[in-house]
C-alpha cells in the first residue's frame, strides 16, 4: 500500500528523478521559463519554490544548502542575487504553470512553467523563438 507517500514516481528510479529535477530546476532558474510535461511541471514546482524561499535570506549556510540541491554555482548566484530580492515581498507562489496542448509523438499533456515576475523582454524572446 502506498499510503501517505507524496510525490510522483514518473517511471524513474529515485536517483534519475533527483537528477532530472536538479537539471530542470537549474534550467528554470537560468531561463525563467521551460516547456515540459504537465506532471513534471507540477512536481518541479515542489523543488523550485523552496529554493526561492531559501534565497530570500542571503547567508553562507543558505547558499550552501542551495548548492547542495542544485550543484551549480551560477544558479546559486542567480538565486541569491536576482531572484531572492525580486521575490522578497511575495510569500510563496513564485511559479506559474500554463497548459499548452499535447505533444505530437505520444499525446502527453504539455505545459510551460515560468517564474511569475518574469520581465517582458524574456516573454517576447520566447514568443519569437517559437
From Swiss-Prot:
Keyword Ribosomal protein carried by entry: yes
UniProt entry tagged with the keyword Oxidoreductase: no
One of the GO BP terms on file: translation
One GO CC annotation: cytosolic large ribosomal subunit
Family: Belongs to the bacterial ribosomal protein bL17 family.
PANTHER family recorded: LARGE RIBOSOMAL SUBUNIT PROTEIN BL17M (PTHR14413:SF16), RIBOSOMAL PROTEIN L17 (PTHR14413)
Assembly with partners or alone: Part of the 50S ribosomal subunit. Contacts protein L32.
Name used for this protein in its record: Large ribosomal subunit protein bL17
Species whose genome carries this gene: Pectobacterium atrosepticum (strain SCRI 1043 / ATCC BAA-672)
Amino acid at each position: 500500500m502506498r499510503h501517505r507517500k507524496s510525490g510522483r514516481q514518473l517511471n524513474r528510479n529515485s536517483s534519475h528523478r533527483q537528477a532530472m529535477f536538479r537539471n530542470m530546476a537549474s534550467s528554470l532558474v537560468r531561463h525563467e521559463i521551460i516547456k515540459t510535461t504537465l506532471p513534471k511541471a507540477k512536481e518541479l514546482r515542489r523543488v523550485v519554490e523552496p529554493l526561492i524561499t531559501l534565497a530570500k535570506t542571503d547567508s553562507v549556510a543558505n547558499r550552501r544548502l542551495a548548492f547542495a540541491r542544485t550543484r551549480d554555482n551560477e544558479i546559486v548566484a542567480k538565486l541569491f542575487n536576482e531572484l531572492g530580492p525580486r521575490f522578497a515581498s511575495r510569500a510563496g507562489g513564485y511559479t506559474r504553470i500554463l497548459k499548452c496542448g499535447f505533444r505530437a509523438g505520444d499525446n502527453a499533456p504539455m505545459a510551460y512553467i515560468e517564474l511569475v515576475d518574469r520581465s517582458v523582454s524574456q516573454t517576447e524572446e520566447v514568443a519569437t523563438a517559437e
